[in-house]
Amino acid sequence: MVDLLVTYMEMRQANPAPARVKPAAGASVALERLDSASYISLYRAVGEPVQWDQRLRMAAEDLERLLALPSTHIYVLRVGGEAAGLCEFNGVGQPDVELVHFGLVPAFQGRRLGPFLLDQALRAVWSHAPQRVWLHTDTYDHPAAQSVYSRAGLKPYEQRMETFPD
């Protein structure tokens, strides 16, 4: 078991700032319906460095069901057609939307692509008029994660130590 400091963040209205400028030629963000193999491939590429394993522990049928839900939105950042990151939301179309996974493939980090992906994805989710978008982040996440979330308009509302399996 491992103890992690978990920070819960939320936003209750869309960020009023202008949309972020595309940081690289050929960068685009789009809602994609990924099959489970494509999803797991991107999930691993983004998540292995920060020890994501939630989706890897799911039964294949459960993952397929989750990916097929109309309330599951996965925004994929592509650079020159190559998948470079993802931003996954659950509960789109409901009052509370959870930002479940967000991150970049390590080769694409450090180029301002993360804030661009998050901004584009949040704008798309806010077009569905939720009352709140929330997430949790922890000490295993990328060191820049909380500052990226804060600049996107998310504010911390709770912190606590939680115990997770190794």
Segments predicted by a language model, with ranges:
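Short amphipathic alpha-helix that is part of the acyltransferase structural core
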Residues: P23-R55
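Short acidic/polar active-site loop segments enriched in Thr and Asp
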Residues: H73, Q131, K155
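Short hydrophobic beta-strand segments in globular cytosolic domains
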Residues: A84, P156-Y157
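Conserved GNAT acetyl-CoA-binding A-motif
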Residues: V125-T137
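Acyl-donor-binding surface of acyltransferase catalytic domains
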Residues: M1-A27
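A conserved beta-strand-loop-helix scaffold within acyl/acetyltransferase catalytic domains
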Residues: M58, L67-H73, R78-V97, H101-P106
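Conserved beta-strand-loop-alpha-helix junction that forms the acyl-donor binding cleft
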Residues: Q109, L135-A145, Y157, E162-D166
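Conserved acetyl-CoA-binding loop-helix of GNAT-fold acetyltransferases
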Residues: L104, G110-S127, Q146-R151
